[in-house]
């Protein structure tokens, strides 16, 4: 098969993101015309980490495209936990702010416990990222409301591409709270048989070879190789590794695409969908505030 023939196997996250953004734009216009409300997203950025600043810019551009009012709240790199919590409290009380996003990671002087405390301080009804334990708990019992954006984007892509999940073997590689755990829950909610693998899993290949659907998010360049997947597998690559010569995913895309029925590229796959689902969540937060 020629390289051109493989193009039909690529899940185009940019096209899907445009579809979601169009839906959000329509919803934003309806909310403004019928209720006089413009959805507002507050983004908290502590310090001046270049990668974090870049991600915030990407999110703001998406807000501009769909008509969401986005505002940055910047704290210096040496900000204290008390200062951060005070800011979050004020945003929780601000009726013009419908959704709050705390850009991670926080500077190194914030302990993991402090980061978690800050995430939990955000009102569950303004939790744009879907990370609050209340929203995670709802997800675990099958009540999907505000869920983490990357898994939400994967589910939307599965639906758009007509991939049946029920009864399928799904393997999640990586068990973070951001992708792995919520992804497993969302697939379980759709009656997939789910295995979650991680750094301590023996013989990862044994699991991936039996998978109909693979979602990988480890940050390990080309962890998933062609000999680790069976013909016809659907693969979502939510990992990213930046090197001097380019950006790479967790999947050896050039070789895996020859066996997969569908696969996301890096970049241009899961990333755009994640940001689009964030926009959808901001609109949802605004609608729930009525």
Curated annotation (Swiss-Prot):
Keywords linked to the UniProt accession: Amino-acid biosynthesis, Histidine biosynthesis, Hydrolase, Methionine biosynthesis, Multifunctional enzyme, NADP, One-carbon metabolism, Oxidoreductase, Purine biosynthesis
Q: Which reaction does it catalyse?
A: (6R)-5,10-methylene-5,6,7,8-tetrahydrofolate + NADP(+) = (6R)-5,10-methenyltetrahydrofolate + NADPH; (6R)-5,10-methenyltetrahydrofolate + H2O = (6R)-10-formyltetrahydrofolate + H(+)
Report which superkingdom the organism of origin falls in.
Archaea
CDD domains assigned: NAD_bind_m-THF_DH_Cyclohyd
Q: Could you tell me the Gene Ontology terms of the biological process aspect for this record? A: L-histidine biosynthetic process; methionine biosynthetic process; purine nucleotide biosynthetic process; tetrahydrofolate interconversion
Q: In which pathway does it act?
A: One-carbon metabolism; tetrahydrofolate interconversion
Task: Report the GO molecular function annotations.
Answer: methenyltetrahydrofolate cyclohydrolase activity; methylenetetrahydrofolate dehydrogenase (NADP+) activity
Question: Where along the chain is NADP(+) bound?
Answer: 174-176, 199, 240
Q: Which InterPro entries match?
A: Aminoacid_DH-like_N_sf, NAD(P)-bd_dom_sf, THF_DH/CycHdrlase, THF_DH/CycHdrlase_cat_dom, THF_DH/CycHdrlase_CS, THF_DH/CycHdrlase_NAD-bd_dom
The record's subunit annotation is: Homodimer.
PANTHER family xref list: C-1-TETRAHYDROFOLATE SYNTHASE, CYTOPLASMIC (PTHR48099:SF5), C-1-TETRAHYDROFOLATE SYNTHASE, CYTOPLASMIC-RELATED (PTHR48099)
Q: Which family does it belong to?
A: Belongs to the tetrahydrofolate dehydrogenase/cyclohydrolase family.
Q: Under what name is this protein listed?
A: Bifunctional protein FolD
**From what organism does this protein derive?**
Methanosarcina acetivorans (strain ATCC 35395 / DSM 2834 / JCM 12185 / C2A)
Provide the taxonomic classification: Archaea, Methanobacteriati, Methanobacteriota, Stenosarchaea group, Methanomicrobia
